[in-house]
UniProtKB/Swiss-Prot annotation:
Residues 1-76 form the Carrier domain. GO terms for biological process: lipid A biosynthetic process. This is Acyl carrier protein. One of its GO terms (molecular function) is acyl binding. Gene3D superfamilies: ACP-like. PANTHER family: ACYL CARRIER PROTEIN, CARRIER DOMAIN-CONTAINING PROTEIN. It is found in: Cytoplasm. Pfam families: PP-binding. The keyword Ribosomal protein does not apply. It comes from the Bacteria. NCBIfam families: acyl_carrier (TIGR00517), PRK00982.1-2 (NF002148), PRK00982.1-4 (NF002150), PRK00982.1-5 (NF002151). Carrier of the growing fatty acid chain in fatty acid biosynthesis.
Amino acid sequence: MSLEDDVKSIIVEQLGVDASEVNENSSFIEDLNADSLDLTELIMTLEEKFNFEISEQDAEQLRTVGDVITYIKTRQG
C-alpha cells in the first residue's frame, strides 16, 4: 500500500467518511466535516502509524489531505 493509500485509509477510518470523499485537495474541516477533536485524534493516529511526533504548530498547518501526505514525505526524508 502506498503512503497516499495509507493516509487516506486512516482518514476514512478516523473521520468516518466515504473513501470517495477523500482526495489530496479535501479540506478536513470544510470537505470532511472534521472538528478539533477529530483532528487531534487523527494527528495522534498518524504519529503512531508513522513513528514520529507532529508538533502542535505543524499540526495547525495540516489543513488538507495533501498537506498531510507532503508533511509525512518530508519527515520520512
